[in-house]
Structures are given as C-alpha cells and as structure tokens.
Amino acid sequence: TGAKPKGISEIKNSPLTKAEGKRMIDELWKNSSPATFQPNENGKIYAGISSKDILQKLDIPSDLDYTDKETFLIDYIHYQKGETDFYFLRNTSPEWISRDIGFRLQNSVPEIWNPVSGEIAPVTVFEQKGKYIRLPLALPPYGSQLIAFRKGSASEQYTSAQKSGQHPPKMEFTSEGIHFLEDEDVILQKQQEETTVSNSLKSHEITGEWEVSFSDGWGAPSNETFPELISWTESENEGIRYFSGTGTYEKSFDFDLTDTENKKIYLDLGDVQKVAEVWLNGERLGISWAKPHRFDVTEIVQPGKNNLLVEVANVWSNRIKGDAVTGENFTNTNIRNTIIPSKGILADDQTRYPWKDVPLIESGLLGPVKISVVKLK
C-alpha cells in the first residue's frame, strides 16, 4: 500500500541504476488508484487508499469486533500456533467493562487461560455468528484475559447471556462454572431454551477500626489505630505520611455463613496501593498486585469470628520526598530530582523536579474491604 515513490536513492556498488529503479516503480504502480490495483508477481499494490479501506474492499472484517470498537477501549494481540489461536485482551480503562466480543474465527472452541493460577476454564457461553465467534467477556480495571481457541465444536454451551442494559452481565468463566458478579437477574439462552439466574449478590463490608503496624526504621510509629481506611499520605502523623515500606493491617470480623450451596465466597480488598499479601484465619491466601484484589475464601471463612491480616507494601518515592521536605535522612540516595509520573500512557514531559515538589503517591489498604457471596452456574 502507499503512494507511488518518486524514485530511488543511488545505492553504492549496486547494479541497479536510478533509471532502472524508476522503470520498476512505474511498472509496479501502473494504473494504481484508489479504485484499482495492479497485479504483479508479488501481490497487489494500492495507492491513495488507507489500509482500513483496502480491507473493506476485500470484504475482510475486523479481527476483533464489539459495539464501541472505535474507542479502542480494548487493546489486543492475536497469535496463532499450529491450529490454536490465542487472543490477549487488555482493558485500557480504569473501570470494569463487559462487552459481547466477536473473534474472527470459525469452528473453534474458546477457553480462558489464567497465567497467574495456571487454570484453564471452558467458555460455556458462545455462538458462531457469521464470520465471528461471539462471547460475553468482562475485564477488570486495566485487566486482561488470555483466550485460546482450539479447533472443534461444542453443542451443550449457552449461546448468549443477557441482562437489562446495553452490555452483557459482568461474569467470569472458571473450571467450576460461571461466576455472576452483579446483583441482577441474568437470562442464559441455549437454542430455543431460556434459563433465568436470579443472582441476589450478598455483600458484607468490613468496617470499623484497623490495627496497623509499620516496619521499623523508616519514620513511622510501630503501631497505629486507623478509625477507617485511608491512604497513608492523608495521615496527620508525618512519619506515616512519608512512610515507605510495609504496613500490616489486622482486624477481626463476624460473618453469617448460611445457604452456600452453588455459591462461592470471595474476599475483596477494594483498592490497594501497591502490593498486598493476605491471610485469613491463619491461612495464606496469596499476593495481589492488580485489580481485582480478590481471593476465594469459600473453604476458609467460617461462621462467627474471623481474623484477617493484610500486609501492604508501597513505593519508595514517598520516603525520599519526606527526607527532602523534613531534612531527615532515612534514605541513602544521591538522586536529588525525578520525573513526575503522568497518568497518560505516553508522557512527553521529561522535566525533572526536586523531590520536595514531587506529589505523594497513594499508599496502603484503601478498601472498601468486602466479603461477597456470588452465584455459581
């Protein structure tokens, strides 16, 4: 594709002359225009027309299709190995999204591959519609999914999942079934049959005081009571406000454990800045560094009293700024200035600022922390 070159540059020690190059260009681009192409042994050349328009003229639809694809809300990569197609999808927004997504494939069965847990889960809601395999997919804020399509067919899957509103319900495909994550009825369709899933989402927010201890040697007190969850940077205590390191949150809470048949129970930490390691009733749940900060506690949470422990580590820059502002010397660094991070993916401003002028970065467990019971289908 592209406009016809005016000529070629002279290449040292090459038998190709400028005149010969000009003749070849004229031959390749002969009769090319937005409406025509010139066949040649290497393919077809289009001039004066965009790649998108060329694909449309050739009746080649988008590789990935969804209602508002012009917004580029979902970034993706398509890779093929043997007879298996892999799609890696990424949510570019800070909010949950759910879309009915079409993948330009035929005669394939989708699976969700989880690179964190190693789990491979079948997608039990999908349909072949024309040139696309369509399925409902939910992505967490800035989250991603790896979907593999293996050659084959499936006859027992649902063909669609619907709720009120423009987009499909927020749900997840797991090896145990579908997890419905919204408090709303969902209609599952299979050929001429409809199944209504009444999903009354039970959620218990863990509120009240938290006991927080901080790692020694970085300016914060050993222990502090937080009446509510806030960023360390909002604390009136200067040592906490400029703290960099690990803070350990401890709290007991009561939970009413009833009617758990065909349900899963999750602990959701809400917002965490930046990395958390979690224990419930002495059982290690794991580490979370990206939303959703959520753990399956179905087999661990117990009726009555439960004990929760969350270790949160933040970034180094807050303590460096604190030293620059207060004149203290908890850090040992010769870096006197830095670039202020931008919220944009591509930041043009490379200006370096003194540490005292650098804004603090939110830190700690921000919540809300919830125990949620979700329906399993």
Give the role of each language-model region.
Residues G102, F253-N281, L308-V312:
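Aromatic-lined ligand-binding clefts that engage carbohydrates, nucleic acids, or primary amines
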Residues T1-T246, D254-T260, V297, K370-K377:
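Carbohydrate-binding surfaces of carbohydrate-active enzymes
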Residues I206, G247-Y249, I265, L365:
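Hydrophobic core residues within well-ordered beta-strands of beta-rich domains
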Residues L146-K151, K251, N307-N314:
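Short, hydrophobic/aromatic-enriched beta-strand segments in well-ordered soluble domains
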Residues D85, I265, A276, H293, ...:
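Residue-level detector of short, conserved catalytic/binding motifs and their immediate flanks
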